[in-house]
A protein has these predicted regions:
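Extreme N-terminal starter segment of soluble prokaryotic enzymes
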Residues: 2-8
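Short, acidic/polar
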Residues: 21-29, 159-164
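Active-site catalytic loop in hydrolytic enzyme cores
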Residues: 64-67, 93-172, 177-178, 182-192, ...
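CN hydrolase (nitrilase-like) catalytic-core segments centered on the catalytic cysteine
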Residues: 67-85, 157-247
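C-terminal beta-strand edge segments of enzyme domains
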Residues: 207-294
């Protein structure tokens, strides 16, 4: 049986209104389904196109919507109609300040998790957001059976702990909405997170027509070695160019699962008893930042 999971990265540019983003998002999901996608993933904060920079805080915060808003629920209904999981992103209304959120709907329209970005960019406009509290992994029903899926968002990628926690919670696939330039160092981070955790990481960015973005959406399958290959392999199975479009990667679940059962990374040889310093909250120079929020 074919064990390839089709992951569609919706590298599309936002419009100026919630309603137009809803319609454009629906259209993109329908096109992804026509391309045989099992999962469709949006870029970061699709509801308002991550349009916060250069605007008054009160102005963009008014664009926040509840997690049960009609905009969000529409993608749950669409997921059921299309028999395709959808990861929809939005600026979530929350107290005391909005959150940067993804909701994953399964192909039956069920809400599997609501994840808010833990590592908000407190050195910039995201200091006016409420950070998320935890990382979540769900068992996602697909045409290939159950797949363990979690999420991190953009800057979360820059902290090894994000992907590590998701791996420890059982994630096989990490969905990562993004809104920033995907240059060699950020791509290297994703490659490294997939490698060290033996997980697949799918990242969806905005195209280069969006300010401070350049496309480059990617999927790393995390499989460095295969028995039929003499040497290591490139784990990148998809990297988009800068153009607007829908890009589909085929993730071989059978190979990923074999690899996770036999190789040496992930949780195979960790020694948590030696890692106590990782739980310390005291900061020392040169890492003291006045913007930091515990």
């Amino acid at each position: 049986m074919n064990q390839e999971l089709n992951i569609a990265l919706l590298q599309i540019a936002p419009t100026d209104t919630l309603q137009d983003n809803l319609q454009k998002g629906i259209d993109a999901c329908r096109k992804a389904k026509e391309m045989n996608a099992d999962i469709a993933l949006f870029p970061e904060m699709w509801s308002n196109g991550y349009r916060m920079d250069g605007r008054e805080t009160e102005e963009w915060q008014k664009e926040a919507i509840p997690a049960d808003h009609a905009f969000v629920n529409a993608f749950g209904e669409l997921a059921k109609e299309l028999d395709m999981a959808i990861g929809i992103t939005f600026l979530e209304a929350y107290d005391p300040q909005p959150r940067n959120t993804i909701v994953l709907f399964d192909r039956h329209g069920n809400r599997k998790y609501t994840y808010a970005k833990v590592h908000t960019c407190d050195f910039s406009v995201e200091k006016h957001l409420t950070p998320g509290e935890d990382f979540y992994v769900c068992s996602l029903d697909t045409r290939l059976g159950e797949v363990q899926v979690g999420s991190m968002i953009c800057y979360d990628r820059e902290f090894p702990e994000s992907a590590r926690i998701l791996m420890l919670k059982g994630a096989e696939l990490i969905l990562t909405p993004n809104a920033c330039p995907m240059e060699i160092n950020r791509l290297s981070q994703l490659r490294g997170r997939a490698y060290e955790n033996m997980v697949a990481i799918a990242t969806c960015n905005y195209p280069d027509s969006v300010p401070d973005c350049n496309g480059g959406s990617s999927v790393f399958d995390g499989i460095v070695y295969l028995p039929e290959l003499e040497n290591s392999r490139d784990t990148c199975i998809l990297q988009a160019d800068g153009s607007e479009g829908i890009f589909v990667a085929k993730l071989d679940l059978a190979k990923l699962r074999w690899y996770r059962e036999h190789e040496v990374h992930g949780n195979a040889f960790r020694r948590p008893s030696k890692y106590g310093i990782l739980l310390e909250e005291n900061k020392r120079e040169p890492f003291i930042r006045k913007e930091y929020r515990p």
